[in-house]
């Protein structure tokens, strides 16, 4: 696991992860209120859409979309979702067709999702510090290899490689 000491380190990690993302990836962000899920998503969106992109939290409308030249980013916040079926009213089937999906508070629909999934877990340690882990159930090792090769965090990476479909990346 990686301790992110401040927002700058969180930005760096989000941008690093964004470099490995591609259409059809689904990223689940977990953590308590104020853990930094939306902040993390904003940095991923900025990577694809530009630093000056006006990024609005989907907390009240549950969904915000952002167009890139090749695909759309669907940013969901499911905190207020009452039932799993409501996700389909938010264009989820369309989102699954060649787009990047970011989901905050995904627990309510996780059973509907099929691999590969990338989970980013953020835990508040204090006002500025977060504990972060990334888990993927992808059979491909491209994400693991990419993060492991990064000069930004490579000295802190402890990658668990096993034959199970779930691979935990402890930063």
Swiss-Prot record:
Pfam families: TsaE
Gene name tied to this protein: tsaE
GO BP of this protein: tRNA threonylcarbamoyladenosine modification
UniProt keyword annotations, A-Z: ATP-binding, Cytoplasm, Magnesium, Metal-binding, Nucleotide-binding, tRNA processing
Species for this entry: Rickettsia felis (strain ATCC VR-1525 / URRWXCal2) (Rickettsia azadi)
Amino-acid positions noted as binding ATP in the UniProt annotation, renumbered to this chain: 7, 34-39, 127
Keyword Nuclease listed: no
Gene Ontology MF terms in the entry: ATP binding; metal ion binding
Keyword Cell inner membrane: no
InterPro entries linked to this entry: P-loop_NTPase, T6A_TsaE
Binding-site residues for Mg(2+), renumbered to this chain: 38, 104
Family: Belongs to the TsaE family.
Biological role stated in the UniProt entry: Required for the formation of a threonylcarbamoyl group on adenosine at position 37 (t(6)A37) in tRNAs that read codons beginning with adenine. Is involved in the transfer of the threonylcarbamoyl moiety of threonylcarbamoyl-AMP (TC-AMP) to the N6 group of A37, together with TsaD and TsaB. TsaE seems to play an indirect role in the t(6)A biosynthesis pathway, possibly in regulating the core enzymatic function of TsaD.
Chief subcellular location: cytoplasm
Listed GO CC annotations: cytoplasm
Subcellular location field: Cytoplasm
Name under which the protein is recorded: tRNA threonylcarbamoyladenosine biosynthesis protein TsaE
């Amino acid at each position: 696991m990686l301790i992110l000491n401040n927002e700058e380190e969180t930005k760096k990690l989000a941008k690093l992860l964004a470099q490995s993302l591609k259409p059809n990836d689904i990223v689940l962000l977990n953590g308590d209120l104020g853990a930094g899920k939306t902040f993390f998503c904003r940095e991923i969106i900025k990577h694809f859409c530009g630093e000056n992109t006006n990024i609005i939290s989907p907390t009240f409308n549950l969904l915000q979309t952002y167009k890139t030249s090749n695909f759309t980013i669907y940013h969901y916040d499911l905190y207020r979702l009452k039932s799993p079926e409501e996700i389909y009213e938010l264009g989820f089937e369309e989102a699954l067709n060649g787009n990047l999906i970011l989901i905050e508070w995904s627990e309510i629909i996780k059973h509907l999702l099929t691999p590969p999934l990338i989970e980013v877990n953020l835990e508040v340690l204090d006002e500025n510090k977060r504990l972060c882990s990334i888990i993927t159930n992808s059979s491909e090792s491209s994400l693991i290899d990419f993060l492991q090769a990064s000069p930004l965090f490579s000295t802190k990476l402890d990658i668990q490689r096993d034959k199970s479909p779930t691979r935990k990346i402890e930063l």
